[in-house]
Regions:
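A generic beta-sheet turn/junction motif
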Residues: 9, 40-42, 51
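N-terminal beta-hairpin/loop module of FHA
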Residues: 1-30, 89
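Thr-Gly-centered strand-to-loop micro-motif
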Residues: 26-27, 34, 58-59
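Buried hydrophobic-core signal for structured, non-transmembrane domains
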Residues: 36-38
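Structural recognition of beta-strand segments within beta-rich domains
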Residues: 15-18, 40, 46
Length: 92
């Protein structure tokens, strides 16, 4: 079962983590309070690990910073998230 965790519209940078102050809150003990940042720049999606305890991975590869493409698996701690880049009007 997939759970859709949409990034709030109207921004180009989103913080992900366990704390409620994040743009996307993911409640799991293996995720740091402020774990990673997703950023959209010139139609390219980037993710940056923010010195998290358990790391950030794209398709199994540990990264400090990397490019996200449609269908990638983004792992924060032990939580896998499917990255889906939607066009306006497209649904998951």
């Amino acid at each position: 079962r997939n759970t859709l965790l949409p990034l709030p519209a109207g921004k180009s940078t989103w913080d992900l983590g366990r704390a409620t102050s994040n743009d996307l809150e993911v409640s799991d003990i293996t995720i740091s309070s402020v774990h990673a940042r997703v950023h959209l720049q010139s139609n390219t999606w980037y993710v940056e690990d923010l010195n998290s305890t358990n790391g950030t991975r794209i398709n199994g590869e540990k990264i400090d910073r990397g490019v996200l493409t449609d269908g990638d698996t983004l792992r924060l701690g032990k939580v896998d998230l499917l990255f889906k880049s939607l066009s306006p009007g497209e649904t998951f």
